Amino acid sequence: MIFTLLGLALVATKSACIAHVFILQLGALDMEALATPLAKVIATSARALHTRSLRASERDKCTNLTARSTRALLAHGPRLRHAVQQQAVAALFTIAVARRRRTA
């Protein structure tokens, strides 16, 4: 419960990328209970990649952490709800688009 509340609090902050360091430390915990709040954190930071206020170094860091967090969440795929899986895949697509724009 504490982790869920902390995850939701991190979503509310301006820089959602901070949450990913926290997410990556949760691998050994019960991902089924934490999947929905973590998916919201991932979706929020994926949207943050489109803001122009991020510097290039912040955007790169956010992109990499979002991708790692999403893969960690999807590693528990069969046990997660379909909606959470869809959110995670959508975040990976957003990351791919952001990376393609940066290199183009």
Curated annotation (Swiss-Prot):
Keyword terms: Glycoprotein, Host cytoplasm, Host mitochondrion, Host nucleus, Secreted, Signal, Virulence
Subcellular localization: Secreted; Host chloroplast envelope; Host mitochondrion; Host nucleus
Motif (RxLR): 52-55
Origin superkingdom: Eukaryota
GO cellular component: extracellular region; host cell mitochondrion; host cell nucleus
Chief localization: secreted
Keyword Glycoprotein assigned: yes
Residue spans crossing the bilayer: none
Glycosylated residues in this chain: N64
Signal peptide region: 1-19
Domain-related comment: Has the canonical translocation RxLR motif, but lacks the canonical EER motif, which characterizes most oomycete effectors identified so far.
Stated family: Belongs to the RxLR effector family.
Task performed by this protein: Secreted effector that completely suppresses the host cell death induced by cell death-inducing proteins.
Entry protein name: Secreted RxLR effector protein 54
Organism annotation: Plasmopara viticola (Downy mildew of grapevine)
